[in-house]
Each structure stands twice: as C-alpha cells, then as structure tokens.
C-alpha cells in the first residue's frame, strides 16, 4: 500500500491561499476513493476543535472539490471513540489543522487518536496537514506552541519522527533575531 504524507507549511483555507495544494490533495483523495465519493476527515485538535476552522475546510473541500467533509472532535469529549473510529474507517484522507502543536501531540497520545492516525496511514489513507498539522510528523519541529502559554515565541520540540528532519513552518523571509 502506497503511503502519502503531505505537509503544508502555512496558508489559509478560508482565503483560498492553499487552493493549489488543496486541489492536489482532492485529486489524490478521489483516486483513493475509486468509484465512491471521496471522504475527508478534518482533525482540529491543535485549534482546540475550532468549528469555524472546520467550516472553512468543509466549504473548500465540499463546494470546490465535491468531497464529503467530516470532523473528529476530541478535545471536549463531544464524540465517542467508536464514532471517531467509524469516521477514520471511511476516510480517504485525513487533514490535520493548525494551531498549538505541543498540545495537539500530547492530546493525541493521551486519547489514542495518534494510534488511529497511524493505523490509517499504514493502510494507505492520505495524511496531510497545515502548520501544526504539517510539522508534527517531523523528528524536530520549530514551533511557537509555548507562546500560547506565555513563554518564548519559537522553540525546538520533538515531533513524531515520521520524517527524519527538522521543519520551520510559515517561512517566507528570514528574520534577524
């Protein structure tokens, strides 16, 4: 089974900044789905299950690419594990949103969501993500997660190590420290 991991360093779904890569993801998802309508599962853990973020995902992938969009809410206990497992079983691609990376990884490990994502990846489900959803797969990630808690702006943190490299998201122009 071919495995695909698509990492989007930054951008905004709502303003269509990522439309070219979204189109690429949609094409892959449709191939994965075969004769069925493609199904995309949005994971908004890093944004603490922000529903407006999911609505932007749904609007883009449903209206532009005709993909069934769904969401897995886990931060506040809205969905049972069995319901989330059903959604993972249907997914042609999983899209991990941006936000607080360190919180997201801690939450995934605590709740078992990481195991579901790993199993989906192993069976050929396309995994993609933006910002926190992109950098989490790397050995080392340069993230501002601690700034949410009032600490320094950017620091190196250990990621999941699926990609043996280091990443810095949202890089446009080098800034002087």
What are the functions of these language-model segments?
Residues 11, 46, 99-102, 133:
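Short glycine-rich anion-binding loops that position phosphate/pyrophosphate groups of nucleotides
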């Amino acid at each position: 089974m071919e495995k695909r991991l698509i990492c989007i360093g930054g951008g905004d779904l709502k303003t269509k900044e990522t439309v070219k890569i979204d189109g690429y993801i949609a094409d892959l998802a449709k191939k994965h789905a075969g004769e069925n309508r493609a199904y995309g599962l949005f994971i908004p853990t890093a944004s603490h299950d922000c529903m407006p973020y999911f609505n932007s995902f749904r609007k883009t992938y449903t209206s532009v690419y005709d993909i069934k969009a769904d969401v897995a809410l886990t931060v506040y206990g809205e969905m049972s594990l069995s319901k989330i497992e059903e959604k993972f079983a249907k997914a042609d691609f999983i899209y991990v949103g941006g936000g607080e990376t360190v919180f997201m990884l801690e939450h995934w490990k605590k709740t078992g969501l990481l195991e579901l994502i790993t199993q989906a990846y192993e069976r050929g489900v396309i995994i993609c993500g933006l910002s926190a959803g992109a950098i989490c797969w790397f050995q080392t990630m340069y993230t501002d997660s601690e700034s949410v808690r009032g600490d320094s702006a950017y620091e190196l943190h250990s990621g999941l190590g699926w990609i043996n490299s280091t990443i810095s998201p949202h890089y446009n122009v080098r800034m002087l420290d």
